[in-house]
Amino acid sequence: MKKLRIATFNVNGMRARLPNLLAWLEREQPDIACLQELKSVDSAFPAAELEAIGYGAIWQGQASWNGVAILARDAQPLESRRGLPGDDGDSQSRYLEAAVHGVLVGCLYLPNGNPQPGPKFEYKLAWFERLIAYAKDLQCSEHPVVLAGDYNVVPTDLDIYNPRSWLKDALLQPESRECYQRLLNQGWTDALRYLYPQDRLYTFWDYFRQHWQKNSGLRIDHLLLNPALSPYLQAAGVDAWVRNEPHASDHAPTWIQLDSRKHR
């Protein structure tokens, strides 16, 4: 294992957020970056702009919605999967997987599920079940694996400024939380929560009601590490400064630092 910084960032629209993305990449220089909510077709992906600052990329776009990408600094990701197994009729661009710098990286954008109850929440739970089934084999792999992305789940009340305002939201429903816990029960390590078991860390601040200014946040962007990778976890955090920039996404990049030696 070599030292690596791996990040996940829901950009909430690649076209609108490209200057913010480039500024973050140049300042923080993650070795691997998983992006969600590109909201653009494949032909509009800014591969040349990313290559100009040293990043190779693979992507799966979708007009107006969804879309995921994996970036690699001074490298080209080697794609291994596009979409989760279990539903050949699912055309939404939500999962992309590649080998990068010796790590198998799964970049995911889990369905939001609102409004609930209803078909969107049912789709969220069905997608989650497919992820859980597929993740089991990845968890058991002898190769290092990270599942990084916007899970659209607030795991516990510690991960939100005030759960009372969100009780009816799909992100906090018992079914959503149970699915996330089932993932962890397979043996995945929630990197931020492992290093900061009691801290209120947020990755998302709604645009409305001055949530950023009041630090009324949610933690819904997660990096899960399998047992082959988790011993190398050295540090983790949130680049909250990105959320304070003009024309910012409502998410901030979340990252982990891996060491070349085991820490546990």
Where are each of the predicted segments found?
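Active-site-proximal beta-strand elements of phosphoester/diester hydrolases
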Residues: 3-12, 102-117, 148
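N-terminal, active-site-proximal structural segment of metallo-dependent hydrolase catalytic domains
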Residues: 1-53, 59-60, 65-68, 262-264
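Active-site beta-strand/loop signature of hydrolases that rely on acidic residues for catalysis
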Residues: 6-10, 25-43, 105, 135-157, ...
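Metal-dependent phosphoesterases centered on the DNase I-like endonuclease/exonuclease/phosphatase
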Residues: 53, 127-220
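Structured beta-strand-rich core segments of catalytic domains in phosphoester-bond hydrolases
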Residues: 38-41, 45-115
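Surface polyanion/phosphate-binding segment centered on an Asp-His-Pro turn
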Residues: 237-264
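Conserved beta strand-loop-helix elements of the APE1-like EEP
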Residues: 64-78, 199, 211-232, 258
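Surface-exposed cleft-lining segments at the edges of enzyme active sites
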Residues: 84-86, 111-128, 164-169
